[in-house]
Amino acid sequence: MAQMSTSEIRGGVKVEVEAQPYTIISNEFVKPGKGQAFNRIKMKHLLTGRVIERTFKSGEKLNLADVAEEEMRMLYKESDGVIFMDEKSFEQIKISLESIGETVQWLLDDHVYEVIFYNGNAVNVEPPTFMEMVITDTSPGVRGDTASGRVLKPAILESGAKVQVPIFVEQGEKIKVDTRTGEYVSRVSS
């Protein structure tokens, strides 16, 4: 099995820790005044979506997880899962909402996503880093809002995701959102 040093691991790398698959969120190198340097690694479990933080000795080797990523088109949502289709073979698979976790808020019909397979089973979905979506509901910006220091307001996107947007953005506008953080990035000109 392939291995990678903790000092080389970056965000997005898939590793196996205690025979469980994780995707790395962040890797922080720490050099204390006394003692050995170590890496504080934040990672998300691929099967449960739970985020944990572990420390490893600097230079320690971690096994790379045996995962495959395939681009698949989302067809539709059901009450207990989401149906995806492989555009090459037209094979359809269903991934449970439990496996997808919070990523479900970024899923739109007829869009392409990275589906992650672990030991031959579809276990998770990764949306693109940035997505363009239409705002379906938000309150109008009221004159004087910025005087009170309020420069953001809540908005609901076409996928159902809730994000904070600047007060000048209105309902029906298309915006660019960072799916990793759920933050507004910019307006999208039509």
Swiss-Prot record:
Subcellular location as annotated: Cytoplasm
Pfam family, one: EFP_N
Biological or metabolic pathway of the protein: Protein biosynthesis; polypeptide chain elongation
Homology family: Belongs to the elongation factor P family.
Annotated Gene Ontology cellular component terms: cytoplasm
Biological processes per GO annotation: peptide biosynthetic process
Naturally occurring in which organism (per UniProt): Protochlamydia amoebophila (strain UWE25)
CDD domains: S1_EF-P_repeat_1, S1_EF-P_repeat_2
Role of this protein: Involved in peptide bond synthesis. Stimulates efficient translation and peptide-bond synthesis on native or reconstituted 70S ribosomes in vitro. Probably functions indirectly by altering the affinity of the ribosome for aminoacyl-tRNA, thus increasing their reactivity as acceptors for peptidyl transferase.
Keywords, sorted A to Z: Cytoplasm, Elongation factor, Protein biosynthesis
Cited NCBIfam families: efp, PRK00529.1
Listed name of the protein: Elongation factor P 2
InterPro entries: Elong-fact-P_C, NA-bd_OB-fold, Rib_uL2_dom2, Transl_elong_fac_P/YeiP, Transl_elong_KOW-like, Transl_elong_P/YeiP_cen, Transl_elong_P/YeiP_CS, Transl_elongation_fac_P
GO-annotated molecular function: translation elongation factor activity
